Amino acid sequence: MLDKNTNLTHQSKIEFVNSNLRGIGFVNNTKIEVPYSLPGDVYNVTFFKKKRRKPSAKLELVSQTQRSFIPPCSAFTKCGGCCAQHISYQDQFRYKTSSLLESYKKDFEIVPTLYPAQKTFYYRNRMDFAVFPGPIVGQREAGSFRHIVDLETCLIQSKESNEELYRFRNLISKFPNLPYDRKSDSGFLKYFTLRKAKNTSELMTILTFVEEFKNTIEEKEFENVCLKSLKADHILFCFNRRKGEISATGEIKILKGMDSYKELVCGKEFRVPFDSFFQPNPEGFQPILDFIEKEIPDSFDHLVDLFCGSGFFSRIFAHKFLKITGIDSIESSLEIARKQMSLDFPKIDSSYLKVDLFSKNSSSKLKVLFSSSDKDVLIADPPRAGLGEFVLDALKDSKVSYFFYVSCNPTSQKSDLWKLKDFFQIQKILITDPYPQTPHLESVAFLKRKNFTT
């Protein structure tokens, strides 16, 4: 059908908004997705196809339904960050969750609990700004990795971070030759990263340079200016390879403070290393932790923490267990977990094991771990792709009694739960929204092994 439409212009009206917050229309049964659109918007659609590429569509707005909500950011639709500032938050949350609700009702006969965001702006604790010649400091353009949208402020990061961004923009304007030019392969500075704790006052600023900038006269001069102009508690220079588009990774030089910042979650102190992952919105993630705290049984001895990272869940719920086993593939994160647990809970039998859970080699280790006792509670927080075949297979034959499945991708989570439906019974599900203005959600499912009796 699409071949017949190629190079012809058709008209399509947006019929609804999907869970990715994109408007959906149709041309002769061919679905089109249109960002930043709403039901009632009309577009001219021209399909075209280049050699060896998938068919694409050129969109031209014909008419737009009246907007009741004005995007507060002037860069909206140009910046690739937010995608829903044209939609009221109430409608955003409904669009993001409605299909999940219906599918859980249909497939599992269960209705998830929904917890909308309490803060819709100024919530994010980390932003990475690309630095381009100009100087231009901003985010990637929507749909393009090569172009940058210059930003004076960002409405989803903290106000303290925006103040530091303002100071940096004033500073870098005096060094026009410092930004790295991706085309000519000249210059030095690639990224400006801000990390602001939510439950402490600490702010970290990280500047990522090409390796050749290290130990130069220019570096020393710029270091002195940064110390005078920037106000963060921790200021770091980071050096990595010239062609790499990775921020806040590589060899570091500490100009001020430490190479980690302090965050508090559930009353526990976390040292967050400059290059490590941490929940982007700890306040928005709190409902997940409250849910687990409420549902964890008191009479169980052993917590298994899969995809444990630096022991986030282990440390928060350690007071309920006698033994903790954490598993992850990144040794540096495991070292942090071991150190923190030995300091906080020296009497708990804790071990953190390096295992690649997406490797076939993990199967035998997981099956031994999961068959050791029916007094085990499992918490798993996998990446967006889900648990993976080897974890799923091990769970099917396991003695794990209670399982908390935390996910940043409820769609892949639901697919995994379907594969486990003959072995575990879903007790409750919570879906929450730590990421307003974007299509992302967080969820937690509480499962009980079907043949387990208390």
UniProtKB/Swiss-Prot annotation:
Is Transferase among this UniProt entry's keywords? yes
Q: What molecular functions are annotated in GO for this chain?
A: 4 iron, 4 sulfur cluster binding; growth factor activity; metal ion binding; rRNA (uridine-C5-)-methyltransferase activity
List keywords of the entry alphabetically: 4Fe-4S, Iron, Iron-sulfur, Metal-binding, Methyltransferase, S-adenosyl-L-methionine, Transferase
UniProt superkingdom: Bacteria
List, alphabetically, the GO terms of the cellular component aspect. membrane
The record lists [4Fe-4S] cluster as bound by C73, C79, C82, C154
Q: Which residues form the active site?
A: C408
The record's section on Pfam families has: tRNA_U5-meth_tr
**What are its E.C. numbers?**
2.1.1.-
Where, by residue number, does S-adenosyl-L-methionine bind?
Answer: Q279, F307, D328, D381
Any single biological process term in GO: rRNA base methylation
User: What name does the UniProt record give this protein?
Assistant: Uncharacterized RNA methyltransferase LA_2977
| Source species | Leptospira interrogans serogroup Icterohaemorrhagiae serovar Lai (strain 56601)
